[in-house]
Swiss-Prot record:
The lineage of its organism: Eukaryota, Metazoa, Chordata, Craniata, Vertebrata. Residues 550-589 are cytoplasmic. This is Leucine-rich repeat and immunoglobulin-like domain-containing nogo receptor-interacting protein 3. The gene is Lingo3. Keywords: Disulfide bond, Glycoprotein, Immunoglobulin domain, Leucine-rich repeat, Membrane, Repeat, Signal, Transmembrane, Transmembrane helix. Disulfide bonds join 428-479. GO terms for cellular component: membrane. The chain crosses the membrane at residues 529-549. Coiled coil: none annotated. It is found in: Membrane. It holds the Pfam family LRR_1. Its main location: membrane.
Length: 589
């Protein structure tokens, strides 16, 4: 008996004495120190009774609760966090969250909610986080969140959303983060987003939206972080799609864009982090990021990058991290950068790198550059295939990392005379180590490369082809072969003569005769002499006619007399002059 009493006393001493634990509901675990009640995975179908009034955190996740009714939580005025994730809640009645003035976190992820009735979140003035993801929401009605003035983070991803009304986000003056993912939205309403003046981060993931319109984000002046991920229908980022934003972080990943959105990026001078990974981008043209003077991180991993043109990263004066891993790059030249002195972390692993002089700048910095634990390795030449750049001995540098300047073979002068409409070719075969790239410069000082599209193109071997030649194509063409070791040039000339007969492109056959008159000194002198002789002949012919006509009139009297009598004038002077009539003798020639 004494032994039994002793064991009973010991058992009583071991019982919890905390006041919160004394009022703990059945099938729940309570903690007095943190004022937490944990009732997760208990197969509960309703809010349990007997929850201590001083509870701060209530965890009811992964149960079978179907509905929240008014008054279910009214006895918990000090509640700060409520977790109702992964139940089967289909209805939340207005007033269900009444008398919860201190509630800061409300989690309703993974339920069966299809609609949020007006007034459900009334009086939740302290709520800062609301998670409604993984439900069955189809539409967000006007003023669904108007009473949540303190809300900072809203999660509504993984729903069946097809429409967000214009005033759905009205009242969310303090919202800082919004996530929309795995919805059926096909467009973004600038009017609905325009109510989120204080929004700082917007995450848009797994959406079937095909285009970013110019006005999508114009009313979000405070947005600093924009994430666009898994938009398989997005093929282009319009130049004005980011207008009005002052982003510091931009991520556009797992889309179908095939080019760097350089025009849209020019307006983002405050950008410090840019992620364009996992897009089918095959080339980075020259100057693609020239206006991003504050950029510190650039990610282009897992794309289809095969070519990065010289000066592609010009303007990136503060670049610290560059991630080009898992692409198709054979090299990365130093002249690609504005300056490599600021670079701290470089990821070029997962590329078929050719270990030659173009990578010498990386090898020389292999002890100070951070490769983030992913060491790049050589794919060629065969002697060092699979060797990590970081582990190459210095003796290898003089054997494999040496360039040979390009040299153009067959330097015989090419002069081609073609008729308008003909196709012509100019050869330019160059050799060097590494293999040089060939470009041509036209008489109009335009550069023609292998990537050019038009009548003039450069074939893989360096040959220039000009289709459908025209007279304005005439002139001197310059071939420029270049690699990391230098360049070599070669000249060719083309003369295009106009065609005599030309078929117009409108479907009507018209014959145009083009006659060329070569103008030289002999032609001018002969033409002048012929003109003078013709003029003099005409003059002589006229004199001859006059002579013959005058002879045909017969003999004429050449002399004749004219008698003239002065008129009488009164006065003395007149009297003295009276002497009769005077005669004049004249001869006609």
């Amino acid at each position: 008996m004494t032994c039994w009493l002793h064991m009973l006393g010991l058992h009583l001493l071991l019982l919890p004495t905390a006041p919160l634990a004394a009022g703990c509901p059945a099938r729940c675990e309570c903690s007095a120190s943190t004022r937490t009640v944990a009732c997760g995975r208990r197969r509960l179908t309703a809010i349990p009774e007997g929850i201590p009034a001083e509870t701060r955190m209530l965890e009811l996740s992964r149960n079978r609760i179907r509905c929240l009714n008014p008054g279910d939580l009214a006895s918990l005025p000090t509640l700060e966090e409520l977790d109702l994730n992964h139940n089967v809640i289909a209805h939340v009645e207005p007033g269900a969250f009444a008398n919860l003035p201190r509630l800061r976190v409300l989690r309703l992820r993974g339920n069966q909610l299809k609609l949020i009735p007006p007034g459900v979140f009334t009086h939740l003035d302290s709520l800062t986080l609301l998670d409604l993801s993984e439900n069955k929401l189809v539409i967000l009605l006007d003023f669904s969140f108007q009473d949540l003035r303190s809300l900072q983070r809203l999660e509504v991803g993984d729903n069946d959303l097809v429409f967000i009304s214009r005033r759905a986000f009205a009242g969310l003056l303090g919202l800082a983060e919004l996530t929309l993912e795995r919805c059926n939205l096909t467009s973004l309403s600038p009017e609905s987003l325009g109510h989120l003046r204080g929004l700082g981060a917007l995450r848009l993931r797994h959406l079937a939206i095909a285009a970013l319109e110019d006005q999508n984000f114009q009313k979000l002046p405070g947005l600093s972080h924009l994430e666009i991920d898994n938009w398989p229908l997005l093929e282009e980022v319009a130049p004005g799609s980011l207008r009005g934003l002052n982003l510091t972080s931009l991520s556009i990943t797992h889309t179908n864009i095939t080019a760097v959105p350089a025009a849209a990026l020019r307006q983002q001078a405050h950008l410090t982090c840019l992620n364009l990974s996992h897009n089918p981008i095959s080339m980075v043209p020259r100057g693609s990021f020239r206006d991003l003077v504050r950029l510190r991180e650039l990610h282009l991993a897992g794309a289809l990058l095969a070519v990065i043109e010289p000066q592609a990263f010009v303007g990136l004066r503060q670049i610290r991290l560059l991630n080009l891993s898992d692409n198709l790059l054979s090299t990365l030249e130093e002249n690609t950068f504005h300056s490599v002195n600021t670079l701290e972390t470089l990821r070029v692993d997962g590329n078929p790198l050719a270990c030659d002089c173009r990578l010498l700048w990386i090898v020389q910095r292999r002890k100070t550059l951070n490769f983030d634990g992913r060491l790049p390795a050589c794919a060629t030449p065969a002697e060092v295939r699979g060797d990590a750049l970081h582990n190459l001995p210095d003796s290898v540098l003089f054997e494999y990392f040496v360039c040979r300047k390009p040299k153009i073979r067959e330097r015989r002068l090419q002069h081609v005379t073609a008729t308008e409409g003909d196709d012509v070719r100019f050869l330019c075969r160059a050799e060097g180590e590494p293999a040089p790239t060939v470009a041509w410069v036209t008489p109009q000082h335009h550069s023609v490369t292998a990537a050019s599209r038009g009548r003039a193109r450069v074939l893989p071997g360096g040959t220039l082809t000009i289709a459908d030649t025209r007279p304005q194509d005439s002139g001197t063409y310059t071939c420029v072969a270049s690699n990391a070791g230098g360049n070599d040039t070669y000249f060719a000339t083309l003369t295009v003569q106009p065609a005599a007969n030309r078929t117009q492109g409108d479907g009507h056959n018209e014959t145009q005769v083009g006659v060329r008159f070569p103008l030289d000194l002999t032609t001018i002198l002969v033409s002048t002499a012929m003109g003078c002789i013709t003029f003099l002949g005409v003059v002589l012919f006229c004199f001859l006619l006059l002579f013959v006509w005058s002879r045909g009139r017969g003999q004429h009297k050449n002399n004749f007399s004219v008698e003239y009598s002065f008129r009488k004038v009164d006065g003395p002077a007149a009297a003295a002059g009276q002497g009769g009539a005077r005669k004049f003798n004249m001869k006609m020639i």
